[in-house]
């Protein structure tokens, strides 16, 4: 325990207090609310029931004044809870809802600024350059394509949510020693109407909290996941004969795309990748026997070693959650599978290993004989069932995959409808360019194309056949081109990463920095 304590204190030595006064600065809430300030850094603004920016700024000023008043926040939250429970929608409910959202967004902006400064300082100290070609989500698949061929076992791990908010506050306390700010956060989380139930009840409560407090929810969850992996590295160092001499670990930051290679040894490489935590985050390390990759709340643990080694790491995860985070996690949820007979879903692809059997005729002097060889091949395919499920939830088709019209888009112009469907189709083609089997992707494109035609026909109160016969089928052809022809319409074209001569099947592009919405919800 003393060694662990020293390990934690060493990495957390850089702390910056005095953040609490920033909650009373108007520009903090302007950063959280302004859509046009910098769309590449900040997420969508807080929706305030039709109020414009000037009115919202006035409300922020009133909020700051009321925070100064004693016991206001307590009464506001209590009023908000009662009114929501009773279904009342009046001025008090509006102000409380707005206050809750803005306080949540303001707190998240403050801590994001803190950790962004630390990240920039780390880059300057280590003289690390940001390689843009490593920003792409597809940059992980060549790694998997190269390493999985030689591994034996794999485990899917779903990282559980913490069961109590106090654990999250204690994690932040190790990084942010500003006591007033942490007390304010603790008070806000305790009094928020759905917080306690969100941590221990069905997914609906999690969904409500994450929707109303997106930035704060992501930051707290990623702080918890970062702490898990921080301790995981410690366990990795203690269990390895090839000790890591240095490493870096960051809380998942929005729009910081880096891949940092800290240490090269004869048989060891440790890599950290940070990505936009609203769409996907990579974090992985590898050594001769263990490989770990994570995307959001799902992790993949693969090994070249024995089943006993995988079992050891399985119980490392379970004990970490039970004894450090006080969360009871059943060990049977982590299943150990042989990679040769298992397919796993990761970042929009169904990945597996296929065995290729071939016979080679060998001739030596006057004798000839046949040699049977078996080679492994990395297979990444489009998960058709998952994508159809996402299309069904978005009301583009039925559960069985039958295309239907999109009623909510019938108020748009014809060009806007076609552009929306076309953009979805092109983005899917671009994102799944690495699939070795395109038949499933063609089916998804067909569903979107026919759904577009049905939507247009519904808007004009006609049938699909009559509508296409009147305007011509060429109307849709322009917007549903192949991925290679449509790249210039989406993003600046960049050189794809073609791995080991597999250009006919796997093409990994280096300009994909966000997960496709359909993939993210599948």
Swiss-Prot record:
The keyword DNA repair does not apply. GO terms for molecular function: RNA binding. It holds the Pfam family MatK_N. The keyword Ribosomal protein does not apply. Keywords: Chloroplast, mRNA processing, Plastid, RNA-binding, tRNA processing. It comes from the Eukaryota. One of its GO terms (biological process) is mRNA processing. This is Maturase K.
């Amino acid at each position: 325990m003393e060694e662990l304590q020293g390990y934690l204190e060493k990495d957390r030595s850089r702390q910056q207090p005095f953040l609490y006064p920033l909650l009373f600065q108007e520009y903090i809430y302007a950063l959280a609310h302004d859509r046009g300030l910098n769309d590449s850094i900040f997420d969508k603004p807080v929706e305030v029931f039709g109020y414009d920016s000037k009115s919202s700024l006035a409300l922020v000023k009133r909020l700051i004044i009321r925070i100064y008043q004693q016991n206001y926040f307590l009464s506001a939250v209590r009023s908000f809870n009662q009114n929501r429970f009773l279904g009342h929608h009046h001025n008090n409910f509006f102000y409380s809802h707005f206050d809750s959202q803005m306080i949540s967004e303001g707190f998240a902006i403050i801590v994001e600024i803190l950790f962004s400064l630390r990240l920039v300082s780390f880059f300057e100290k280590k003289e690390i350059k940001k390689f843009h070609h490593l920003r792409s989500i597809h940059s992980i698949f060549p790694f998997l394509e190269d390493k999985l061929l030689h591994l034996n076992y794999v485990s899917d791990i779903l990282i559980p949510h913490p069961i109590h908010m106090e654990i999250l506050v204690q994690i932040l306390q190790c990084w942010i020693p500003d006591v007033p700010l942490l007390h304010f956060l603790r008070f806000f989380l305790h009094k928020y109407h759905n917080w306690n139930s969100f941590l221990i009840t069905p997914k609906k409560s999690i969904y409500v909290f994450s929707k109303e407090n997106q930035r704060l929810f992501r930051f707290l969850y990623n702080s918890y996941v970062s702490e898990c992996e921080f301790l995981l590295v410690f366990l990795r160092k203690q269990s390895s004969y090839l000790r890591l001499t240095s490493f870096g670990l960051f809380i998942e930051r929005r729009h910081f795309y880096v891949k940092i290679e800290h240490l090269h040894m004869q048989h060891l490489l440790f890599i950290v990748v940070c990505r936009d935590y609203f769409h996907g985050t990579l974090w992985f390390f590898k050594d001769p026997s263990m490989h770990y990759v994570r995307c959001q709340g799902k992790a993949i643990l693969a090994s070249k070693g024995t089943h006993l080694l995988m079992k050891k790491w399985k119980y490392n995860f379970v004990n970490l959650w039970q004894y450090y985070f006080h969360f009871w996690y059943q060990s049977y949820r982590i299943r150990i599978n042989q990679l040769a007979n298992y397919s796993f879903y990761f970042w929009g692809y169904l990945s597996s290993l296929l065995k290729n059997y071939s016979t080679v005729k060998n001739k030596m002097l006057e004798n000839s004989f046949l040699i049977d060889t078996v080679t492994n091949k990395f297979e990444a395919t489009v998960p058709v069932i998952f994508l159809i499920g996402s299309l069904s939830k978005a009301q583009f088709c039925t559960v069985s995959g039958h295309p239907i019209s999109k009623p909510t888009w019938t108020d748009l112009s014809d060009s806007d409808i076609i552009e929306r469907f076309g953009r979805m189709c092109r983005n899917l083609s671009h994102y799944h360019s690495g699939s070795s089997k395109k038949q499933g992707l063609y089916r998804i494109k067909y569903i979107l194309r026919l759904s577009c035609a049905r939507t247009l026909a519904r808007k004009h109160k006609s049938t699909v056949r009559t509508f296409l016969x009147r305007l011509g089928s060429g109307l849709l052809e322009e917007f549903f081109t192949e991925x290679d022809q449509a790249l210039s319409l989406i993003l600046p074209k960049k050189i794809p990463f073609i791995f080991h001569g597999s250009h006919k099947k796997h093409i990994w592009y280096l300009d994909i920095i966000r997960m496709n919405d359909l993939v993210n919800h599948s």
